[in-house]
Amino acid sequence: MDQINVLINKLIYDTMNNITSLMLAVSNYEIHDNYDTVKSLIDCGFDVNAVDKHGKSVLMYAINIDSDKNINVIKLLIDHGADVNHVDSYQRSVLIHTCMYMEYGYNNKTISLLIDKGANINYICNGKNILMMIHKYLSEETFQEVFHLINNKIDINYNRSGIIRENILMRIIKKLDNKYSITTIKLLLEHGINIDHINIYGQTALMYACIYINGLKNIPIIKLLLEYGANINSKCTKGWSPLMSVFKNDIIDIKTIKFLVEKGAEINSKNCKNETMLYVFCKKLSTRIYGQACVKIFDFLIKKGISIDNPNDKGYTPLMAFIIKISEYNEYTEKFIKLLLDYGANINSKDIHGSSILNKVCCDVVSGSVSHCKIEIINTLIKYGADVNSTTLDHKTILMNLRYSIHSENYITVLEILLRNGANPNIYDEKYHKFPLLIDILNRGGELRIIKLMLQYNIDPNIVDNIGNNALLFVAKHYKKNERFSFLKLLLTYGASYNCVNKKGKSFSDYVLDKEVEYYSRTITNLSKDNRIMKNVIDSIPIKVPEKIYCLESFKMKIIRFKWNLCNRIDYDDEAIMNYLGTNDPVRLIQIIDESIKYDH
């Protein structure tokens, strides 16, 4: 009973979908030899061009997976007038139906038969012609069909009307995976395919070979394309040349680069962002694992005369591109930096906003947007001469730019590195800056340890803001009772003047509460008696002092060296200095020198 129901349902389905007995017979080849059945039905008058509800013809029913086994039935239908160019309701031709099963390696004989019988090889379905449909299944068998299509003058220069507009040459290069792909490329070139065809991005087949074919496999293709006239210095819409396109590849091989350069590729070509190949390479290195092979590429490009310091349209140099985006510090990182510097890269170059490499890296670290490896980069940059006091176009030093992130966990680490290496915390211009650095940090709620560190490295608490407040007045005026004691004492300890009067005529005493007067009076009295309070200031003199702060041959530096000799009990018999300072007592000499340096800014 169940079998009867199945048969009834199938009969109803076939009737509703206009499926004829001939359609069923031609598609039944996998069960038994259906040739005689098909011939009998044709002889009985069944229409070989009948179509079902979806416009699928009898010939299309005969074509399925491995329809080469049904080749005799297909020939029979064609011999009896089956239309080899019929198109179904989905705009698929008979030949398109045949190509749909090429993925499984079938239907090669069927394709040849249809072509020989007049099937339109240039029919377009969904933006593709037949060649574009079967090229991705290239093998020993399918290559014969490609050869057959080309010899029958299929339009090899057709380019898909879709989004990218690639031609068949580009598509084969993009998927190149066996020797038949290379043979097909050569066949297309021999038959005159347009080697200069560009997609919507302006990319050529040569650029595709540089981008998509990994490693040494691309050299034979590149060589072949150049032999047929490919322009080695063409540019896409973004200005990338084939040589620059190599660096879009997942595998960058120096032999490919050398080959292109030897064939005349312009080594200093720039893209639309004014980026050179070296810039692109440096940027690529920042986001991938690199090693000795990349050092060799660096060395080759530099020795070939590539521009070392050419900035892009944002003012970024190759060195900046490498350093700013780097995510890993390994044994080759410093080698790359040194190699660029040795050949003329400027470690203090700035972008269009006046921001130096060191400024950018320091700001990245304190903002928490990068890994810990950037701390190593900061030390390396300073080691090779990065200016710790460089300023941006808005007259801000690195220390000033960092103040926006004083609550970052990395802030104090970076701050100490900069101060230890000579960053001047006292640079201030009332015309451009509202607050001196110390007052600005206090205004932003800087921790006591930050203030102490800056005072230890000689920041001047007596530089006043635009209304005349020094750091002591600022804290006394704005800090609440429960948080200001430790700050005020620290500032007094490091020489903040309690006699400072602001533009409103207010001094420290005006902001001290009545019940605080006795405490601060006693504190000031005790500090004035202590000759040792400035020792922690001078002990923190930067290990590397900028020339614009202290000239090494100046009398001030001689005094500082004299003080160090005193502290280390080295011979300090310098009559000129002792006469100048008016004493030969070691303790008093140290005190006078400390006070002299502290109040000079």
Swiss-Prot record:
Gene3D superfamilies: Ankyrin repeat-containing domain
UniProt source species: Acanthamoeba polyphaga mimivirus
Sorted UniProt keywords: ANK repeat, Repeat
Protein's recorded name: Putative ankyrin repeat protein R841
Pfam short name (any one): Ank
SMART domains reported in the protein's UniProt record: ANK (SM00248)
ANK repeat positions: 17-50, 54-86, 91-123, 165-197, 201-234, 238-269, 274-310, 314-349, 361-390, 397-427, 432-463, 467-500
Tree of life domain: Viruses
